[in-house]
Every structure is written in C-alpha cells, then in structure tokens.
C-alpha cells in the first residue's frame, strides 16, 4: 500500500476507504455478553472510531486506524478481538502488542472488564515480570495475549507461546513502538505468525516506519483516520473555587449546593476512599447520592449507572473510572472535588457535561497546593479557568 491518502486531517474530518458507519453498539452484531460488558464498562454510544472500525475488524479485514488516545481506540480493538475469539478454543487466538508495560496492563484490564461476561482468558506477557509466571500462563492456555515486543518474542522463540492458532495481531501505538527500537523484534514476530493472521494497526501518526509495515504485512487494509474528538471544552464554562485547604472542601460543596439548582451532577475524587468519605457525608446531609469506583463489582456498577441515568439519584460521585466514555446526557454540572492527578483526565472528566453540543459547567475545587496543577491544565488545553462568580446560580436557571 502506498502512503497516498495517509495524512493529517482537519479536526472535524474523518477520512476512510470504508463506508459502513454504525451508530449503536446493538447494531454491530456483537455477542450479547460483549454488549453487556460494554454498557457495564460505561460506554453508551460508540465513538467516531468505534462506529467505523469495529465492523471491519470483526469481519476479519486488516485495519489501519490513525487515532490518538482519548478517542476510544483501546475499546475498539478490545471489543473486536473479544467478538472474534472462539471461547471453546483454548489456544492463543489474539496477540496485542503495546510499547510499554503500563499500556499493556491497561489494555489487559480493559479486556478483562469488557469481557467480564465471556469465558475468555487474558494474559499480560511483559518485561520486568517473572519469566516463570509467563511460562505457566502459556502452558495453561490463554486466548488473548497482551504484551511488550521483547518478552512476547522471547516466549514465541522459546516455544512457550505457540502461535499456530493466532488469527489476530493488533499493534497499539505502532508509531511509538517502531520508533523505540522494537522494529526488528516486531518484524520477527510477524514472520512467526500464520500467514492468514489479520493485522490491526493503531497509530497516532503515520511515519514511514508505520507505512512500511502496512506495505509488508497488511492485505488491502481498511484505512480510518480519526482526529481526536475536539468537542471537549467547547460550550463548557470552567470555574475554580479557591478552597485553600482540603478540610474546607466539604463545607464549600454544601454552600455551593445552597446557591444553585441542578438536576444532576457528577463529582470526581482522586481516590476510592475519598469517594466513600464524601458519599457518607452527603448522605448524612440528606442528598441523594450514588458512588462508583473501580473496586465495585461490575453488576453493582451497572445498577448504579442505571439509577443515575434514570434520575433516581441526583449526584454521582466517581473516581476516574467514569471519566472516559460515559455520556450522561442530563448532566449540566461536573465538580472536580479533587483536581485530577494527571492533565489528560481533566478533559475526560469535564467533557462529560458538554457532550453533543449540550452546554455544561465545570467547577474545580482548588487548594493552595493545586494552583500549579491548575495552571498546567490551562496551559495544556490553551484554556482559561476563571474564578467562580458570586452569581453562579444564574447559570443554572
């Protein structure tokens, strides 16, 4: 494949050589238990890349997707891989490579969550972990392997990882991997896979290294180029309240609720213990509150989200688990009780309120220690977070 048509695109453009766009998860012909896992994970509607890439991947086509993090790309290949796995065949059927251990583990967790109701085994084969554990996992049989190139190649070469039944090879952040000195190992892995293996490649950019892979190892790929979703901060008014000290946050929250009338709000905290603390305190003040965090069983998360969507609970307190991929249409207010511990999550948290053109308000509680982080966030997103005006209530009338 030549590099024609592979180029940076305007933020509102999606460029592809594949015409089918599917706007609902229910219309993707997925196994019912995958759809259950998707909704449980927090997705309601597919993102731009999910609308376009899941179908060709589940059809077995080679796919080249240019997409950055924050577009829903991990769930795209996770859903597709789970759909293609034969649950009765215990051999490895899908191999996913990532440039770092952290990303590999993150992907494994997404697969485990979305595949919660399936009988699918997943294993992370990554450097820096026990070789023996790896060997045991391969001996006992794993259907999906997520790993870093060095360790995966090592396992294949030593014949612990048997590739005969692999039908999907997915490379996440391919540009990152190919520029980080993994090229030779990746090429060697390619050569040790069955010739019929489907190749799915995700990359934020399309340098020569990536295009070379598409030419050498991909068969007439579907190309999907999706720029990062820029609806993010548009239409969302961002404010901060200088609470000075952590201990003053709760009183500040109660004062805020006295001065505004809001249908529903999401409040973000950085830790599970803070979520639980705040939930208890607000319930004691007679607020109708739900809480959600990563340690809750999936069934419980499903119920909580259902209650919140139906409006029977007015405040949802959450950790960053919720910050990606959930569209709660009626939320007009997001409160960062804690500023996020990394800048990237800010947009996922507050983007919630303004999705699909809906206006929203985001209020950040800022202690003296948080001022630096808030300035970093402003710089990172080229945005301005203003001090909350005294007449904030007028925004909600």
Swiss-Prot record:
The UniProt record lists the keyword Ligase: no
Catalytic activity annotation: ATP + H2O = ADP + phosphate + H(+)
EC number: 3.6.4.13
Residues that, per the record, bind ATP: 67-74
Leading EC class: hydrolase
Cell location: Cytoplasm
Protein name: ATP-dependent RNA helicase eIF4A
Record organism: Scheffersomyces stipitis (strain ATCC 58785 / CBS 6054 / NBRC 10063 / NRRL Y-11545) (Yeast)
